[in-house]
């Protein structure tokens, strides 16, 4: 057992359950509500940079952009492609309320599933368009940005004088 087995169940590392996120992605209203949140100073990045699939707030748009390319996010999206696990699934596995479970699966495949996929496509388009102009890296210190701009200006000036002299 040991002390590390306890860390797996720590509440501060607990993420939102897949069935709740699946419900968020199933309607356009909930997706729009999560994308256009009001400013909240208690959340990272004032609550403006939110990953719906992972249910996480990011500090900056750059952090959100790198998160969307990461393994953790891609794994979470893959988990959300299937039908979420509910009490009905476990009851059907035990042999109870099998008809109720089959009706639920049919409902998901006919109505909720296609709507969720279209919402995910709209979400991807929205994130691509909003994060298209975001740089992939940011300076760690404020004065480093000014130095980096001065260095790039000096390099381009040196290249232009070198090409003009030849």
UniProtKB/Swiss-Prot annotation:
- Pfam families in alphabetical order: zf-C2H2_jaz
Q: Which UniProt keywords apply?
A: Cytoplasm, Metal-binding, Nucleus, Ribosome biogenesis, Zinc, Zinc-finger
InterPro entries, per this entry? C2H2-ZF_Maturation_Protein (IPR051879), Matrin/U1-like-C_Znf_C2H2 (IPR003604), Znf_C2H2_jaz (IPR022755), Znf_C2H2_sf (IPR036236), Znf_C2H2_type (IPR013087)
Give the principal location in a single coarse category: nucleus
Nucleus as UniProt keyword = yes
What are the record's GO terms for cellular component? cytoplasm; nucleus; preribosome, large subunit precursor
Motif annotated as Nuclear localization signal, chain positions: 7-16
GO MF terms listed in the record are: nucleic acid binding; ribosomal large subunit binding; zinc ion binding
Does this UniProt record's set of keywords contain Zinc?
Answer: yes
State the compartments where it is located. Nucleus; Cytoplasm
Q: Where is this region: Nuclear export signal-like (NES-like)?
A: 17-31
Subunit architecture: Associates with pre-60S ribosomal particles; released from the pre-60S particle very early in the cytoplasm.
Q: Which PANTHER family match?
A: ZINC FINGER PROTEIN 593
Task: Describe the family membership recorded for this protein in Swiss-Prot or TrEMBL.
Answer: Belongs to the ZNF593/BUD20 C2H2-type zinc-finger protein family.
What else does UniProt say about it? Present with 5630 molecules/cell in log phase SD medium.
Q: What is this protein called?
A: Bud site selection protein 20
């Amino acid at each position: 057992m040991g002390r590390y087995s306890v860390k797996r169940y720590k509440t501060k590392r607990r993420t939102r359950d897949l069935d709740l996120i699946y419900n968020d992605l199933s309607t356009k209203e909930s997706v729009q509500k999560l994308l256009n949140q009001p400013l909240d100073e208690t959340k990272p990045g004032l609550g403006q940079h939110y990953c719906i699939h992972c249910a996480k707030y990011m500090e900056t748009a750059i952090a959100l952009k790198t998160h969307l390319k990461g393994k953790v996010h891609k794994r979470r999206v893959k988990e959300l492609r299937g039908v979420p696990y509910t009490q009905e699934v476990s009851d059907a596995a035990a042999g109870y309320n099998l008809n109720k479970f089959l009706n639920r699966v049919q409902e998901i495949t006919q109505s909720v599933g296609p709507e969720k996929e279209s919402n995910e496509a709209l979400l991807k388009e929205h994130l691509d368009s909003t994060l298209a102009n975001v740089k992939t890296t940011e300076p760690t210190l404020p004065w480093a940005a000014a130095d980096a701009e001065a260095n790039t200006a000096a390099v381009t000036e040196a290249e232009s004088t070198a090409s003009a002299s030849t």
